[in-house]
Amino acid sequence: MNKVLKNSWALFLGMGFIMMAYGFQGSLLGVRAVQEEFSLTATGFMMSGYFIGYFIGAATIPNIISRVGHIRVFAAFASLASLIILVHSILIHPFVWFLLRVLTGISMVCIYTVAESWLNDRSSNKNRGSVLSIYMVILYGSMGVGMFLLNFSAPKNFEPFILVSVITSAALIPILLTKKKPPTFKKINAMSFSELYKSSPFGMVSSFFYGTIQSALFTLLAVYATSMNFTILE
């Protein structure tokens, strides 16, 4: 267990930065959308682009990793995510932001796939649950810290967008400097939804409802709070 954690510290640190930026970005865009007077329909449409990108990325990422490897994929899509948030601050329109959210979704699912396949390869059946639980604590803890960074500067300014980009870029440093070899890519045949349901009906159904609730909370909670005249600190 300790050996796995020692060999994966760069990945944990990199994902901590990624999720800090992700948590910051989600709250920032929600608050800014209200300040720009986007309609609720436009805001919901814009924020849903992330999950459309998630589906697209999930279908394409195995082929990309098989061609260029884990580290290059992580670096490329973290760089793309860093670039995208800066474009948000320049082109302020619901449809443009929707397209940018699609690209963000693609980037994030690629990053998640690299991280979780890496950890899965490094761990065994005996310690995989413990390793992944630490990974999840880091993810959600970092996301919470990122949301608090909304107090750094007013969402109307450029500075919060720049800070998200800086944090995302910082995630590249430990990953690119690690001496540990990435896992060998093992391409697995995709499962259909019916096959997945037969394999784990409870897991599939519970994941669907969990994702529905989580996506609403993480994407629209800041919108609701701002509409109810909560302060940024609150």
What residues fall within each predicted segment?
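Helix-loop boundary and gating motifs at the non-cytosolic
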Residues: K3-F51, S200-G203, S207, S215-Y224, ...
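Residue-level signature of mid-helix packing/kink "hotspots" within the transmembrane helices
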Residues: F51-A59, M143-G144
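Helix-to-loop junctions at the C-terminal end of transmembrane segments
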Residues: G57-H70, A154
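Helix-breaking motifs and short loop linkers at transmembrane-helix boundaries and internal kinks
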Residues: G69, I90-H93
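Structural signature of the two symmetry-related core transmembrane helices
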Residues: R72-L86, S165
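Paired small-residue
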Residues: F95-L103
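Cytoplasmic helix-loop-helix junction between adjacent transmembrane helices
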Residues: V102-V137
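C-terminal membrane-cytosol helix-exit motif in multi-pass small-molecule transporters
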Residues: L150-N151, S165-F185
